[in-house]
Amino acid sequence: MPRSPDSYHDPVLLHECVDALVRGPGLYVDGTLGGGGHSMAILRALESGGWLEGSLLVGIDQDDEALHEAGSRLAAYPGRAVAVKGNFQDIARLASREAVQKGLEPRARAILLDLGVSSRQIDRAERGFSYMRTGPLDMRMDSSASTTAADILNDADERELAAIFFRYGEEPRSRAIARAVIAARMKHGPLSSTEDLADIVRSVVHGRQPSIRSLSRVFQALRIAVNRELDVLQRVLEDGVSVLDEGGRIAVISYHSLEDRMVKQYFAAQSKCDWGPKGVGLREPLSRGTLVPVTRKAVVASEDEVRVNPRSRSAKLRVAEKTGGVQ
């Protein structure tokens, strides 16, 4: 897949998302706008299908740089696309507001969530997301948020740090790394840079490949903790489904097992029917599920896409469709 000319990073599983979501006119919501790559592809598909008239794409992001980049691209579709600053946990309110202002029904035809950190954010050392670049221990998706990675590393005790590294990073050496962080704080004072943290992890986990894996897990864990990503994901799944129209679809791209597991379990739980107590033998369920999985299992990137865009290697796409069941 060639690099998209209108995105500041390669949008992952682009064709798979468009094929699953674009099926007619209506309200389309990109809850993780980023550079606008997915949104632009959706708009082009709507245009080529003759569905642009009567459609609106709402792109949501809390990153000011992303909004600036994507907003300039969405301007190519005046009146049909809008970039909105906000956290995607407010997806229903933000999308409904924009739809009503444009005279559309506040029910979404499709919702897309591309989770995780964009390549642009990782590449910017001052954002503090990567152990490969020296920068401040920040890791905030929303630069106006109060808590940084440095705050957590310097304020939490050993038990709290170990819990963060284990729960959010699934790091097997979580306790040893937490002890090393506390020791470094006592010896050298507060941690301030990504290099400080990377050096601590390397002092505990030896060997190039093991240390790289642990570095990835520890930095992931801190990013999730700083941005409360799993709590937010649970809310955005519930909020997103609530604003979906009957027959509307929600597509979620995740990049690590914690996110994918949460999405899989949520879709499965919402697809179950309530047949009442065992032994009653009802002919019809008391209530039907609100979702039907469109993808039986997670969709992964092709070998060709992974070759062109290595970031797609860990991506998993799950899609579900809203039914007429009672939520």
Curated annotation (Swiss-Prot):
Binding site for S-adenosyl-L-methionine: G36, G37, H38, D61, F88, D114, Q121
Protein keywords: Cytoplasm, Methyltransferase, rRNA processing, S-adenosyl-L-methionine, Transferase
Short name of one Pfam family: Methyltransf_5
Gene Ontology CC: one annotated term: cytoplasm
Transferase keyword on record: yes
EC number(s) from the headed UniProt entry: 2.1.1.199
Family assignment from sequence similarity: Belongs to the methyltransferase superfamily. RsmH family.
Function, in words: Specifically methylates the N4 position of cytidine in position 1402 (C1402) of 16S rRNA.
Matches recorded under PANTHER family: 12S RRNA N4-METHYLCYTIDINE METHYLTRANSFERASE, S-ADENOSYL-METHYLTRANSFERASE MRAW
Name assigned to this protein: Ribosomal RNA small subunit methyltransferase H
Lineage, opening ranks: Bacteria, Pseudomonadati, Chlorobiota, Chlorobiia, Chlorobiales
Gene: rsmH
